[in-house]
Structures are given as C-alpha cells and as structure tokens.
Amino acid sequence: MAHKKAGGSSRNGRDSESKRLGVKVYGGQAILAGGIIVRQRGTRMHPGENVGIGKDHTLFALTDGHVKFTTKGAGKKHMVNVVPAV
C-alpha cells in the first residue's frame, strides 16, 4: 500500500496585528502642539484643557506644554490636560 491518507485541515493559524494603543506621552513630559498623547478605543480618558480628540478617540495636544493627568468627579473620570509652556 503506497498510499498516504489526506491530512486533516486546521482552522487555527491566524492572529490580528496589534493596534499599538495606549499612552504615548506620560505625565510631566513635554509635548508639542499636534502631538499624540493617548491612542484608545472609546473614551477611557477624556480631553481636558488644551487637549483635542480625534474621530478615533485619539487625544492630542492643542498647544505646546507639559502633559498632566487628573481625575474628576465622583466616578473618577480620567482627564488629560496640557499645561502651556510659559
């Protein structure tokens, strides 16, 4: 018998590419206007003073300065602020 049975097929072997989410500039670090501070899915962190939000919920600096993370309210909402450079 010189025959070989067909091998079974597998439904595994795929994985999605990582999206590189998270904090890009930490508290106290300097940032330029337009610089990305946080990449996120949904508003885990909310924009504060001198911070804008993109259509994919990315937080970015509107002015040059230093990043400052704070919490606000009873639910402890995470806010991201940029303190302008003097």
Curated annotation (Swiss-Prot):
Question: Which regions span the lipid bilayer?
Answer: none
An example molecular function term from Gene Ontology annotations:
structural constituent of ribosome
Q: Name one GO cellular component term.
A: cytosolic large ribosomal subunit
A biological-process GO annotation: translation
InterPro entries (UniProt xref): Ribosomal_bL27, Ribosomal_bL27_CS
Q: Where is this region: Disordered?
A: 1-20
**What superkingdom heads the lineage?**
Bacteria
Keyword terms: Ribonucleoprotein, Ribosomal protein
SUPFAM superfamilies in the cross-refs: Ribosomal L27 protein-like
Q: Which HAMAP family match?
A: Ribosomal_bL27 (MF_00539)
Protein family per UniProt? Belongs to the bacterial ribosomal protein bL27 family.
Put simply, this protein is called Large ribosomal subunit protein bL27
